[in-house]
Structures are given as C-alpha cells and as structure tokens.
A protein has these predicted regions:
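Conserved GNAT acetyl-CoA-binding A-motif
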Residues: 103, 107-122, 133-135
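Active-site rim helix/loop that mediates acceptor-substrate recognition in acyltransferases
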Residues: 19, 25-73
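Basic/polar N-terminal segments that are highly enriched at the extreme N-terminus
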Residues: 1-5
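Conserved acetyl-CoA-binding loop-helix of GNAT-fold acetyltransferases
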Residues: 84, 89, 95-108, 120
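Conserved acetyl-CoA-binding loop of GNAT-fold acetyltransferases
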Residues: 27, 130-138
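A short beta-loop-alpha structural element at the N-terminal edge
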Residues: 6-18
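A conserved beta-turn-beta hairpin within the catalytic core of GNAT-like acetyltransferases
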Residues: 70-83, 94
C-alpha cells in the first residue's frame, strides 16, 4: 500500500527526528557520517539559506531532504546554486515514492527562489530521473 505523505518545510520540532531517520535510512556504516553532515550544515552560516523538507505520515517524520547554498563565482559573476544532500527515507517507507516527492518539492521551491544550479551527492542511478547528470564518469 502506497503512503500519502505530507511534504512541508522542517520546523524546530522536527530536528530531533532527523538524525534518527538518517541512522535508520543509512545504517551504522554510513549513518554516523550522514548525521554529522546534517549537524554541520545546519550550523554552517555559509550554507545558508537552507531548504530542509520533511515528509510526514500520520504526524511521524518518515523522510527528509536538505538543500544548502553553494557559492559559485565563474568569471566573477555569482551563480545561485544549491547542494542536495542528504536525502533519507525510513526503511519501512522506501520504494513508495517519498524520496522522489521530497526531491521534486525541493527542486520546485528552489526554482521558484531563482536557484540556477543544483548539485547532488548521492546514488548515481537514483538522481538522473530528476534531470541530474554525472559531473564526470570513471
């Protein structure tokens, strides 16, 4: 049965659930590093403004995506850019479209805010469906 999540901006009350979600989603190997990344980005003033979205089902946070600001100045002209990382969905809710809904909602909001370019750190077979291309191939 597919879930019908509610996608919204994260609020302070969601903050405790986000590291727990990341650990559940990424496991004990990658989870601690992802939790550290989230913590670092949330307090890094150079990464502001952030777009932090959650997916909730029955009031429970089951998904989270974080977009942080990236500063680019090719040829001296600043380009509005963001970094998508990390994206986490609780294992019980994976493969139901929640991650895709979070990414799509985030990209739509960033586009509306005038962001020109979005980079992603993540699974190379997952993100092309959203229009992402590999920066290099090895």
């Amino acid at each position: 049965m597919a879930l019908a999540p509610h996608i919204r901006k994260a609020v302070d009350a969601d903050i405790p659930a986000i590291p727990t979600l990341a650990m559940s989603s990424f496991g004990t190997t990658e989870g601690p590093e992802i939790v550290q990344l989230i913590g670092d980005l949330l307090v890094d003033v150079t990464a502001q403004p952030l777009l932090s979205l959650v997916a909730t089902v029955d009031g429970r946070v089951v998904g989270h995506v974080l977009f942080s600001k990236v500063r680019l100045k090719p040829a001296g002209q600043e380009v509005s850019a963001a970094l998508l990382a990390p994206l986490a969905v609780h294992p019980d809710c994976q493969s139901q479209g929640i991650g895709g809904q979070l990414v799509a909602a985030g990209l739509e909001q960033l586009s509306g805010a005038g962001v020109d370019l979005v980079f992603v750190l993540g699974h190379p077979r997952y993100y092309p469906r959203f229009g992402f291309l590999a920066a290099c191939r090895t």
